């Protein structure tokens, strides 16, 4: 699993952003190396609410950054992974789960 920060960088979390960008490249490299025997894909979520106990500050931050005006949950990640598993043709791809954050 990568992270949306792999595409935009982070002034506060340089090492984290760099490591997620490296995972993005690793997804591409492994997909090229091991095709057609193995499909290699990843997901890159942005702000996701994992439970209702996430702080109000976290929830407000997520809402402000989403053009969908809602907070994604772990269910969105599960659906993306299921989609990637169900495809016989997709490899070397990353699905961004951002609620449109990349559009702002």
Task: Indicate where each model-derived feature is located.
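Active-site helix of classical SDR
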Residues: 19
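C-terminal substrate-recognition "lid" of short-chain dehydrogenase/reductases
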Residues: 73-97, 102
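Residue(s) in the substrate-gating loop at a strand-loop-helix junction
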Residues: 3
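Active-site loop immediately N-terminal to the catalytic Tyr-X3-Lys motif
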Residues: 8-14, 69
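Conserved SDR Rossmann-fold cofactor-binding beta-strand/turn motif
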Residues: 39-49, 85, 96-98
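Alpha-helical segment proximal to the catalytic Tyr-Lys
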Residues: 31-36
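Catalytic tyrosine of NAD(P)H-dependent dehydrogenase/reductases that use a Tyr as the general acid/base
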Residues: 16, 24
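Catalytic Tyr-x(3-8)-Lys segment
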Residues: 57-76
């Amino acid at each position: 699993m990568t992270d949306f920060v792999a595409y935009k960088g982070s002034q506060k979390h340089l090492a984290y952003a760099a490591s997620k960008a490296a995972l993005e490249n690793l997804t591409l490299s492994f997909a090229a190396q091991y095709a057609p025997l193995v499909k290699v894909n990843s997901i890159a979520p942005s702000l996701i609410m994992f439970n209702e106990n996430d702080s109000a500050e976290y929830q407000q931050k997520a809402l402000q950054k989403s053009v969908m005006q809602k907070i994604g949950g772990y269910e969105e990640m599960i659906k993306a992974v299921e989609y990637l598993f169900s495809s016989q043709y997709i490899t070397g791809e990353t699905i961004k789960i951002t609620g449109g954050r990349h559009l702002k």
